[in-house]
Structure formats: structure tokens, C-alpha cells
Amino acid sequence: MKIILVGGGKVGTALARQLSEEGHNVTVVDTNKARVEHLTESYDVLGIVGNGSSITTLSEAGIEDADVFIAVTGSDELNLLCCMFAKKAGHCHGIARVRNPSYSHELDFIKKQIGISAIINPEMAAAKEISHLLRFPGASKIDTFADGRVRLIKFALTAEQGLDGVAIREIPTRLKSDILVCAVERSGGVIIPNGNFVLQNGDQVTFLATQEKAHEFFQRIHLPVRPVRNAFIVGGGAIAFYLSQELLENHVRVRIVERDPARCMELAEQLPGAQILNEDGSNREFLLSEGMESTEAFVALTNIDEENVLLTLFAKKHSKGKLVTKVNRLEFDDILAGLDLGSVVYPKYMTCDYIVQYVRALQNEAGSNIKTLYRILDDRVEALEFTVHEKSAATGVPLSQLHLKKNLLLCCITRGHQILIPRGGDQIQVGDNVIVVTLEHGLHDLRDILDKGAEG
């Protein structure tokens, strides 16, 4: 597909890499010449130095025959303007990143009036992810499928769980838990395990289950399941605002530390149920004096990654509460993984995942479309949910007879109100939603799960 990408910052760079690696013809537009040169030298993309809201620049980029137009500059208004002009000049699908909370209640109206196909608000998405984690604090990461009915949950395995030396196939009978272990991170590597795989303390385990079954499993392995009742947030930006709104609706006590007095006034007006503290969040004495040690959740949401990391390490030393750390830069995730920062949330990853998911779905003319896509375990594993629209080589055949690709696990089938952890005799049917976890990147369709070389 021909894709025009306006904005070559962190998100734009990640998208340029991902989309070009998937074989798309990508043209990047940015006003910064050095940034454009870096992208064209680093990835298989074309680059144009110019303003994405200029008709001349759009024409030079080939807007007339573009399939997808993506605007991820640092300005919401510019992103919307770019998409509006692109819609007028071409006939492509438009995707805009819009972050300002003042637009949050107007997104549907904006999409309809401007003709944008999709709007992504990474701060709102990050707040929802953090809210899920605070409702299920034993997990370090939670992703949802099947309209929220199925969850992919990650946790760190310690001696307290009593699973050291246990084979995965033993879990259902030993713990009477209907869950499926989908991936294990060990010693820097990632494994898609089979039933004979033996767990070890120190593993990062990702499993799939319904919310009810996940709750039961965590109780049986002595991980906390009670939602937090109070949260201590450092940083009063957009994520803190969205998160606090959701927490207050669920009767969670919220304290926000923000150093900017003007921003404190805004938050006090917008969040009358929260306690707003005007102070430098890096003031350790202040944090301790305000009861950080007794908080059930500590969430570091400043705009500086290094400050968030240090704050979380300090909180880890003094508090037993749930820890959540926001990180913007994508390039240091492998280093951060060794620091045990609790749950690390990357808003920019969420933006990329959503857009890549949308582009892959557009690429399918018919058949099985991607409904949901997550890249997990430091971007090394993809978890995808496909909707089955028509018969194919993957349907109507017992799963035990399907030749699946290596390092791929078919985890779940949802059929109407049924949620199935599939067995060898089960079959995929038209109308099903199918969830797979794989080390292979770039799957576009359910048929891509089959190892065509092994057939026949």
C-alpha cells in the first residue's frame, strides 16, 4: 500500500520502520531536513522536506494515489488540518493523532465532519491500560480481546507462586485453573511454550484467560487481585487527568503531585474529587511526608523518562504498593526491563500498534480481518485477534490437523457468547474470533498462521 506519513518524531520513526518492513511504500513528510535525511538513510522510505498541510507538498508526496494518510506531528490541530487537506486532495484513509483532552468529547464529530477514518489518543489509551492494572494489581501488563471478555496477562514468577518446576500441562489439574500460558520470557529470550515446558522462578509469564478465570488463578498462586483503593500520581499531564477521571468514578482516592501552579489550578477545577498537591515530585522528603509509603499504587507520569524511572525506584524502596512507570522513549526498553519498574507503559507503542493494526486490516480485501493487535514482550511477540468472515484452509478442520507455523500458538476461539480454550478436536468456523500469539511479525490474515511448506 502507498502510505504518506506526516511527522518524523518518535512515533513517526517507529511507524516508518514498521510499515516499511511490512512491505508498504512509505513517504515521510517533515519540516526538519535532518530528520527526513535520517529516516531515508535508516529505512526503506522516501522523504520530503515540507509542511504536511501544504497542497503542494501533498501533491509532491503523491496524495492523489495514496491509500493511507497518517498525521502524527506534535500538534493536534496540524494533524487534523493535514488529514482534512489530504481528504480533499486524495481519496485515502486518514488517521490522526489527537492528544488534547479538550477534544476528547468531540472526536466522533471531528471524524464525521473532516472525514477522518480514525483518531488515536495515546494518552487516553495509556490511562485505560493503567486503570486496568490498578484494578488487577498482581499483573504487570494486561491486554484485552473479544471486546474485553478475554485478557492476556503478564506476571513475574517468584517462589511465592509455587510454580517452580511445574510443567505447563500440569497447571489445569494441579490448580484447577482454566488458563493457557502463551509466552514465557526467560534470560532475555522469549519462548512460545508447549505443554511440556517447565516453569522456573524468575520467568515472566504471559497467559490468556477470561477475567473470572484469571482472578481465580491469581488467588491460587497468591498474587493480589483486589483493586487498589488509593493512588499516588506524580505528574499532572493528560494521562494523569484521564486516569484520575476513571479512578474517581470507581471510588479510588487520588492524589496528584504537580510542580506547575497553573496546572494545579486547572486540575483542581477539572477533578474536584482529587487532592492536588503543588510540589516538585522529585522532592523525596515531601513524598514520604504525604504518605507515599502507605499508598496502594504509585504512578510516575512526569514528562521526563529519567525522572519517572528514578521516582519508581525510590517508591519501590519505600512502598509495597503497585508501581506503574510511564516511558516515552522506545529505544531503551531492553535496559528498563532489567530494572523491575513494575508495570511500564509506553503511550507511543500504543499509537504504533493501533495504526499498524488499522493498516493491516485495510490490506485485506476479504476473509479474515485483524480486529485487535498487540506487540508484547518488548516488541518481540505479536498477539492478534482475527475475525473469520469466510471459509478458508484454516476453517472446518480439526486444529490437530492444521499445520501451524512454528513459534505460533492458537490461544482462544470466541463464538458468540462462548469462549473456548481450544483443544485438538475443535474447529475454526465462519463468524468466530480467533486469538493467536506468535514470534513472527507481519501476519495479515488468519490464513497466514498456516505453514504452507508443511502442507500436503
Which residue stretches match the model-derived regions?
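Cytosolic regulatory regions of ion transport systems
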Residues: 1-456
